[in-house]
Amino acid sequence: MMQDLRLILIIVGAIAIIALLVHGFWTSRKERSSMFRDRPLKRMKSKRDDDSYDEDVEDDEGVGEVRVHRVNHAPANAQEHEAARPSPQHQYQPPYASAQPRQPVQQPPEAQVPPQHAPRPAQPVQQPVQQPAYQPQPEQPLQQPVSPQVAPAPQPVHSAPQPAQQAFQPAEPVAAPQPEPVAEPAPVMDKPKRKEAVIIMNVAAHHGSELNGELLLNSIQQAGFIFGDMNIYHRHLSPDGSGPALFSLANMVKPGTFDPEMKDFTTPGVTIFMQVPSYGDELQNFKLMLQSAQHIADEVGGVVLDDQRRMMTPQKLREYQDIIREVKDANA
């Protein structure tokens, strides 16, 4: 029972403390907001008191030799003196006020007290306080020299484009020259399609070695070549040697012939060639020719080269196929 009572007292005390903190925070915030709300009124009152005090001081002051001596100097000194005096923030005199100095304005009695002493430097600063900002002083001798300076200002602005226009006039024929006649390109003559071609492949030994004659003979016979005309090997339509020859195999060394007894024979390589057009489908014959070259290269340990005796690439194979298609189209 005592523990429950103690717990209740702790909770009630915590709630009371929180309520006091919230009340104190709310009260301070309310006082602060009221303080900021009353501050602009105090500023306005203080400004009005300062303005009234300045007016009283100026009315009490007399016109002495010092003030007359300052006006007799150049007007720039008077303007600098006016700029040095602090003015209220709400005073503002638009630039167009000096352009209309002759408009009749009814001034309050305070401004008419010293009518004979217009050169006083204090009047231009205090007069805008007693009258609207857009009403100028009709008797300000310092503002008169400004009006004749406004008229000559636009003259050089309007006269500036004239020499610019004259400068551009002689450049008109240069800016728009007549286009020179462009010679028409000569018509490109279509390259005549070839009507026949020879596709060449090479099977060569690695650099610094030669192909063995006995291994070469076995691989040639396994690829379906038969020794025949011109002492070279031919691949016929039929493996038994019947039918027209599709492509042939010759020695890479001149004169390119072979000796059927090739046990003691060595050579750096052999050349396989096919003449297009040939019997049957030339593209199928080309595939068979490529397979035969790869088989011989694998058996003798050589490599397949193109007609320039460079390593065969897929791009070169596509070039061979394009040549075959071109010949077929020319003979169609």
From Swiss-Prot:
Cited SUPFAM superfamilies: Cell-division protein ZipA, C-terminal domain (SSF64383)
Keywords, alphabetical: Cell cycle, Cell division, Cell inner membrane, Cell membrane, Membrane, Transmembrane, Transmembrane helix
Bilayer-crossing regions: 7-27
Periplasmic-facing ranges: 1-6
Any one GO BP annotation for this protein: FtsZ-dependent cytokinesis
Membrane topology: Single-pass type I membrane protein
Segments on the Cytoplasmic side according to the record's topology features: 28-332
Keyword Magnesium in record: no
Stretches for region Disordered: 42-190
Subunit and interaction comment: Interacts with FtsZ via their C-terminal domains.
Family to which this protein belongs: Belongs to the ZipA family.
Name of the protein in question: Cell division protein ZipA
Species annotation: Shigella dysenteriae serotype 1 (strain Sd197)
